[in-house]
A protein has these predicted regions:
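Membrane-interface loops
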Residues: 27-42, 47, 70-154
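Generic transmembrane alpha-helix motif of multi-pass integral membrane proteins
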Residues: 64-69
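Residue-level signature of transmembrane alpha-helical entry/exit and packing/kink sites
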Residues: 9-13, 17, 79-80, 159-162, ...
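N-terminal transmembrane-helix/juxtamembrane module of multi-pass inner/ER membrane proteins
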Residues: 1-63, 109-114, 118-120
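Aromatic-anchored segments of alpha-helical transmembrane domains
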Residues: 21-26, 88-96, 164-174
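Membrane-embedded catalytic cores of phosphoryl/pyrophosphoryl-handling enzymes
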Residues: 119-199
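Alpha-helical transmembrane segments of integral membrane proteins
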Residues: 52-56, 60, 79-83, 132, ...
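Hydrophobic faces of alpha-helical transmembrane segments in multi-pass integral membrane proteins
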Residues: 15, 19, 23, 82, ...
Length: 199
């Protein structure tokens, strides 16, 4: 195990998820004045519990893509690191400076697996610090960092599959009422900005 870690020292960058995650947790515990995020389009988007599946897949997509590229193509992995972690820090800084919340989550009452998953998410993911959406930022940032270098030209099916999942992840945030459309746009803006800065 020690030899494996010595050989793959770049895996250590993934420990930054714990650091930024700790800061995010702290931002949710502080008694900050959270401002409500809402737009008219949010009211027109229906609650669609089945979208909890791509929302949950985000938890596999982000570390999975980064781990895969760490072994498959270290150059792309480094670009992912330079795009994702500074962007996460920026988002967390925004959470401290401009704390936000949503107040339009439904009760998700009734039976069925999808509604149960939504209730579980609601119980464990507080509707605070929603702008910009970390779900959308990280999904878009990882996809851009992975395929912007031309990697997708030789791995077209992989690129298309990733793009479809990223779109579904972004849609899921509004269809299960975890985010406002404004949060999605904010996350996309941060992702594109960090991607451009990372080169």
């Amino acid at each position: 195990m020690v030899n494996f870690l010595k050989k793959h020292k770049d895996l250590g960058w993934l420990s930054l998820f714990l650091v930024v995650g700790g800061l995010y947790f702290l931002s949710q515990q502080l008694p900050l004045d959270h401002r409500s995020v809402h737009c008219a389009l949010d009211d027109k988007i229906p609650f669609w519990p089945a979208f909890c599946i791509p929302y949950v897949l985000w938890y596999l997509y982000i570390p999975g893509m980064m781990l895969y590229m760490c072994f498959r193509d270290p150059a792309i992995y480094h670009r992912q690191v330079l795009t994702v972690f500074p962007g996460m820090l920026l988002c967390t800084l925004i959470f401290f400076i401009y704390p936000t919340r949503i107040d339009f989550r439904p009760m998700s009452e009734g039976t069925g697996f999808f509604r149960w998953v939504c209730r579980f998410l609601y119980a464990n993911d507080r509707p605070m610090n929603v702008f910009p959406s970390l779900h959308c930022f990280e999904a878009i940032a990882v996809h851009l960092a992975t395929f912007a270098s031309g990697y997708g030209k030789t791995h077209r099916a992989f690129q298309i599959g990733s793009a479809v999942l990223v779109v579904l992840i972004c849609l899921s945030t509004v269809f299960i009422k975890q985010h406002s459309v404004l949060d999605v746009l904010g996350g996309a803006a941060v992702a594109c900005t960090m991607h451009a800065l990372a080169g």
